[in-house]
Amino acid sequence: SQNMGYALLSLNKKVVIKDNQTRAVTVSMIQILTSEHDLIVDDSVSFEAEHLVSGSDEVVCHLIRGSESHVIDSQHILSEDKLDRQTGTTTRVLSIVSEHGTFKRNDLIKLVTSVELTACEATNISIKTPTRYTHFSLEIHDQPTAVKAPSRLTHKWDAIRNGFYQFGQEQTKLTTREDNGVMQFEHSLLFPKQFTKHLYSWEFNTPD
C-alpha cells in the first residue's frame, strides 16, 4: 500500500541555560498532508515525526474534506516509536486509518502536537516532502506570555524549488536539497529573547 506522501519534521534545539535557570517554551506543530496521487485507493496514511525533546505525547489528527473538518478518533491512529541508538533520537511513526473507507484526493490531514523547549535560542527546522508538492508556507504566530491579548504576527514562507524566508523586514534565502526524489527545505529560526508561543503551519499543495 502506497502512502499519501509524508512530511518529516525534525526539531533540533540548541539549549542555553544561564544562571542555572531553566525556562520552557511550548511549540505547537501542525502538519497538513495532501494526496500525491490522482486517485486515492489507500485506506491509511503514515508519517514520521522526530521528537528530540520530551513533551506532550498527544497527537490530535483532523481530517479536512472541503469545508468539513472533524477530529479523527484515536482508535484509528496507530503509533510506533523507533529509537536511533547512535544519535539517541526517537522517531515517531504514525499510521492513520480512514474512518470512511478511503482517503480522497485533496483530503487534508492536519496533525497537531507540541513539545517543550528548554531555554532555547535557536531551532533548526527541516522538512521533507515529495517534490510534487510545490507550494510550501510557514506561518508563525507570536503570542506573548503576558495575560493581555496576544499579538497575531503572521509570516508566510512560499517556495517553489528555491525561495526565500521572510521574517519581518529580514529576508533569508531558503535552502533546498533533493534526495531520491524528495525535496528538503531547511532554515534556521532564531527565537526572540522573550519566550513566546509559536505556531508553525505547513501547507503542501499539489500543483494545478
For the regions a protein language model found, what residue spans apply to each?
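Lumenal/extracellular ectodomains and adaptor appendage modules
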Residues: 1-208
